[in-house]
């Protein structure tokens, strides 16, 4: 039997079930097995590994994962795809499909039920564009014990995850992801290898979880508040952004100027020029003056 991710087999499956693509669910099926293999290769899935997939579609990536992993768990929100997955994944007894929205699911419960304690597990997925960021944040903030993520996403979002200070792509998303993970852009994927064809190109991004965050901060929540406030209006200075947008901090520009100067950061700089280390230093200094 041909792999699912060939143009003809995908077309046959879609026609057999009369499946219509829902734009609202970001359904674009990959029809290139070479790209799928690059994804699985970079996940470094071994015979004892587990994989979590989000949005398996008709099972193209799931199939490649099932050939290599000990266990694959796939979250699929669209009930119409369940009978299709029953057929396409029938040869693989190591796959469990869960008909739930991963954003609402108790992922820790699923993890403990489906995987062995201490098992090497990766999140491997062709993520729906419209929920890429919420999914990554949910799985990172809930501290799911996975080794990392190899995910396909909109190229523009991938560029933001990997961005360095001083670039137009660099922002609060870059800092949040790099705080938890090491980011690597594996490859750009042209829009032509999807059905239906999206309007943008994609990228495969690998995120390997750090043993501990890249910087030490006194208060994680406050650190991210400082970061978000610093990027509230990109063209404004740190001084203006922090004095107008940092909740729980005195509206005192003189105090803010003094703190910024003390930690060696020019108040006239913009947030996009600060490294993650500078943001950590700044938030650790600012929190000493936070209103209780």
Swiss-Prot record:
Keywords: Cytoplasm, Methyltransferase, RNA-binding, rRNA processing, S-adenosyl-L-methionine, Transferase. Belongs to the class I-like SAM-binding methyltransferase superfamily. rRNA adenine N(6)-methyltransferase family. RsmA subfamily. It is found in: Cytoplasm. Signal peptide: none annotated. SMART domains: rADc (SM00650). GO terms for molecular function: 16S rRNA (adenine(1518)-N(6)/adenine(1519)-N(6))-dimethyltransferase activity; RNA binding. Specifically dimethylates two adjacent adenosines (A1518 and A1519) in the loop of a conserved hairpin near the 3'-end of 16S rRNA in the 30S particle. May play a critical role in biogenesis of 30S subunits. It catalyses: adenosine(1518)/adenosine(1519) in 16S rRNA + 4 S-adenosyl-L-methionine = N(6)-dimethyladenosine(1518)/N(6)-dimethyladenosine(1519) in 16S rRNA + 4 S-adenosyl-L-homocysteine + 4 H(+). It comes from the Bacteria. One of its GO terms (cellular component) is cytosol. PROSITE patterns: RRNA_A_DIMETH, SAM_RNA_A_N6_MT. This is Ribosomal RNA small subunit methyltransferase A. Pfam families: RrnaAD. InterPro entries: KsgA/Erm (IPR001737), rRNA_Ade_diMease-like_C (IPR023165), rRNA_Ade_Mease_Trfase_CS (IPR020596), rRNA_Ade_methylase_Trfase_N (IPR020598), rRNA_adenine_dimethylase (IPR011530), SAM-dependent_MTases_sf (IPR029063). Its EC number is 2.1.1.182. S-adenosyl-L-methionine binds at residues 28, 30, 55, 76, 101, 126. It comes from Bacillus mycoides (strain KBAB4) (Bacillus weihenstephanensis).
């Amino acid at each position: 039997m041909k792999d699912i991710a060939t143009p003809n087999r995908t077309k046959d499956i879609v026609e057999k079930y009369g499946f219509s693509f829902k734009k609202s669910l970001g359904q674009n099926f990959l029809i290139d097995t070479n790209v799928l293999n690059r994804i699985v290769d970079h996940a470094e899935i071994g015979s004892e590994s587990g994989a979590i997939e989000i949005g398996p579609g008709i099972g193209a990536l799931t199939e490649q994962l099932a050939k290599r992993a000990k266990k694959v768990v796939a979250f699929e929100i669209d009930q119409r795809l369940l009978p299709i997955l029953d057929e396409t994944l029938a040869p693989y007894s190591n796959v469990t499909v869960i008909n739930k929205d991963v954003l609402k699911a108790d992922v820790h419960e699923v993890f403990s039920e489906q995987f062995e304690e201490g098992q090497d597990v990766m999140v491997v997925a062709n993520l729906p564009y419209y929920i890429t960021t919420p999914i990554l944040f949910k799985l990172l903030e809930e501290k799911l014990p996975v080794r990392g993520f190899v995910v396909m996403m909109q190229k523009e979002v991938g560029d933001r995850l990997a961005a360095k200070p001083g670039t137009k792509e660099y922002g609060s998303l870059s800092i949040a992801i790099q705080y938890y993970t090491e980011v690597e852009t594996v490859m750009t994927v042209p829009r032509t290898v999807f059905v239906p064809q999206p309007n943008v190109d994609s990228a495969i991004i690998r995120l390997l979880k750090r043993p501990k965050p890249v910087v030490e901060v006194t208060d994680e929540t406050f650190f991210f508040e400082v970061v978000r406030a610093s990027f509230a209006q990109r063209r404004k200075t740190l001084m203006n952004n922090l004095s107008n947008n940092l909740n729980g901090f005195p509206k005192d520009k003189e105090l803010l100027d003094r703190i910024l100067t003390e930690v060696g950061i020019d108040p006239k700089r913009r947030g996009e020029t600060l490294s993650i280390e500078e943001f950590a230093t700044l938030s650790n200094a600012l929190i000493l003056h936070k209103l209780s």
